[in-house]
Design a protein with these regions (language model features):
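Positively charged, low-complexity intrinsically disordered leader regions
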Residues: 78-79
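Interhelical loop and helix-boundary elements at the membrane-water interface
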Residues: 1-73, 82-132, 136-345
Length: 346
């Protein structure tokens, strides 16, 4: 995820030291030895993965917070809940490894998916799990459509192919944060906001994946003039319909799995709100892409690209937008926009 290099030996040492420290602390509580090792292993494994994708000292924050979250859940819930949480961890491992093998994710993307999956599967359970799995599985499959056509855009878009950790964080991170906030301060609205953030991610992803299949050039959302396929801020009829379909699917799944099947959480009004928020966020994403997202020009081939480095790793020159505002940050802003929109209207 960053410039720091991590090794298997280092991660193994991290896991073992964390296991010993957590087990020693839990042993003082008088819990059974089996439970101590069980809980310590879960905490140590989660903390190790948090450390593996951290960089530039951020592990000083991610490791203790991640370990505290898992430990708090295990110590404040029943053994049955802890068993279900363990199944969630196992499920997160399977999803991350399988996605890595299928080249849906890079190694850092798989690690980030495990962290996000543990939180969603283990704490949120099925009501939170099914929407994010729907987004991830269907979006990953869509990314494989028109592979040859999309390969031609590799020089323009910042990232392509297997999704890395930042892409996972950009699309699923806001939802994961909302779930954690809902865990700390329980309220039905958190699920609604969670669904809205995923509707935004689904609408944007489906709009992009389906839109690139269009035989006609997209048009700028600002000027409505034709722009090359893959240009940030470009929209098309088929891409917009793809965004609407993605938001509709996510809203529908959220309605079907709403906690306790309570209409008070996601009824018809909430369903329409999630659907509309997803579409609005997708358009907001395109607007940011056309106006504020960083655009660079390669000094070698003169192509305009989202990449900060292009031909043979040569550093590109910024020609528009804000240098720090890349596609991942635009996606996070779009998810935040969807959440804010729901808060205002609801």
């Amino acid at each position: 995820i960053g410039p720091d290099k991590k090794s298997v030996e280092g991660s193994t040492a991290m896991f073992l030291s964390s296991l010993v420290i957590v087990a020693a602390a839990l042993a003082l509580t008088g819990r059974p030895a089996g439970e101590v090792l069980w809980f310590a292993a879960l905490v140590a494994f989660f903390a190790t993965v948090c450390e593996a994708i951290s960089y530039q000292g951020s592990d000083n924050l991610t490791v203790p917070l991640g370990a505290a979250l898992v430990l708090h859940y295990l110590l404040t819930h029943t053994r049955g809940d802890a068993a279900i949480f363990s199944l969630g961890v196992g499920m997160a491992v399977v999803v991350a490894l399988l996605s890595y093998r299928l080249k849906f994710l890079s190694s850092s993307g798989a690690a980030a998916t495990f962290i996000l999956g543990t939180i969603v599967f283990g704490i949120g359970r099925w009501p939170y799990t099914l929407p994010i799995l729907t987004f991830f599985i269907l979006s990953s499959l869509l990314s494989k459509l028109g592979k040859r056509r999309k390969q031609k855009l590799a020089g323009m878009i910042e990232k392509g192919g297997a999704r890395d950790a930042w892409q996972v964080i950009a699309n699923g991170g806001p939802g994961g944060l909302l779930l954690i906030l809902g865990y700390i301060w329980p309220h039905p609205i958190w699920f609604l906001l969670y669904a809205a953030s995923l509707a935004a991610a689904t609408a944007d992803t489906w709009g992009t994946e389906i839109g690139t299949l269009s035989r006609n050039d997209p048009r700028s959302i600002v000027t409505f003039k034709p722009v090359p396929v893959g240009t940030s801020g470009g929209i098309s009829v088929i891409g917009t319909l793809g965004s609407a379909l993605g938001s509709l699917v996510l809203a529908g799944v959220s309605w079907l799995v709403t906690p306790q099947n309570s209409p008070a959480v996601v009824g018809l009004r909430e369903f329409m709100l999630i659907f509309a928020a997803g579409i609005a966020a997708s358009l907001f994403d395109s607007l940011l892409g056309a106006t504020l997202q960083a655009r660079f020009r390669c000094p070698v081939c003169s192509k305009v690209t989202e990449k900060s480095h292009h031909c043979r790793g040569v550093k590109t020159e910024i020609v528009g937008g804000l240098a720090w505002l890349n596609n991942d940050r635009v996606n996070m802003a779009a998810a935040a926009f969807a959440v804010l929109l729901v808060l205002i209207i609801y």
